[in-house]
From Swiss-Prot:
Annotated GO MF terms: adenylate kinase activity; ATP binding; zinc ion binding
Keyword RNA-binding: no
UniProt family annotation: Belongs to the adenylate kinase family.
Annotated binding of AMP, by residue: 31, 36, 57-59, 85-88, 92, 160, 171
Keyword set includes Metal-binding: yes
Record localization: Cytoplasm
Name of this protein: Adenylate kinase
Record keywords, A-Z: ATP-binding, Cytoplasm, Kinase, Metal-binding, Nucleotide biosynthesis, Nucleotide-binding, Transferase, Zinc
Catalytic activity annotation: AMP + ATP = 2 ADP
Originating organism: Salinispora tropica (strain ATCC BAA-916 / DSM 44818 / JCM 13857 / NBRC 105044 / CNB-440)
Length: 217
């Protein structure tokens, strides 16, 4: 199965991508992993991407799409894959459709993790990161035994700028402007399936697997 996972920040895409890819026995492919691999190996695309990243600029779609093309052409993706973090915009989605045609295949399904904004803010704003070991705690879901201190190393916990409500609100607006239109794009292709991504991680995984079974069956 060839699958794309979409959803707002804080929806749990990374976690669910791992479980769903393992269930399908296909590689989980994230743009972050692709970028790191190309940059560390010094590929021509990696060199281009690093130039933009070092300048604090966004990597152009053309570079990103070519990296994705190269990754999807590898043997382990021949029988299927799960894309996490790509596409993020409708132009990227159209480019993905085209490159899959060039590879002689097509996307099967787009799984949307549905979470409302209030839940996203609750999840992300509750994160606290250890200044010592980097472990991430949560004031509600995974609180340390001593408030403000890491159980693992005893160092101070702090709230990253990315986890502050005002930053989260900005990220949600960007998602609504750029990524949410993917729902309409893939809905028009009858490839979109949405699941409730609230509740325990295990419950969300069960819903995701059930949705895939319904599609396959």
């Amino acid at each position: 199965m060839r699958l794309v996972l979409v959803g707002p920040p804080g929806a749990g895409k990374g976690t669910q991508a791992e479980f769903v890819a393992a269930h399908l026995a296909v590689p989980k492919i994230s743009t972050g992993d692709i970028f790191r691999s190309n940059v560390s190996q010094g590929t021509p695309l990696g060199v281009q991407a690093k130039r933009y990243m070092d300048a604090g600029e966004l990597v152009p779609d053309e570079v990103t799409i070519n990296m994705v093309r190269d990754r999807l052409a590898e043997p382990d993706a021949g029988e299927g894959f799960l894309l996490d973090g790509f596409p993020r915009t409708t132009p990227q989605a159209a480019a993905l459709d085209k490159l899959l045609v060039d590879l002689g295949t097509a996307l099967d399904l787009v799984l949307e993790l549905v979470v409302d904004d209030d839940e996203v803010i609750r999840r992300l704003s509750g994160r606290r990161t250890c200044r010592g070991c980097g472990k991430v705690w949560h004031v509600e879901f995974d609180a340390p035994s001593q408030e403000g201190r890491c159980d693992r190393c005893g160092a101070e916990l702090f709230q990253r700028d990315d986890d502050k409500p005002e930053t989260i609100a900005t990220r949600l607006r960007e998602y609504a402007d750029k990524t949410a239109p993917l729902v309409d794009y893939y809905g028009a292709q009858s490839k979109l399936v949405g699941i409730d991504a609230t509740g325990p991680v295990e419950d969300v995984t069960v819903r995701a697997i059930d949705a895939l079974r319904s599609y396959s069956g």
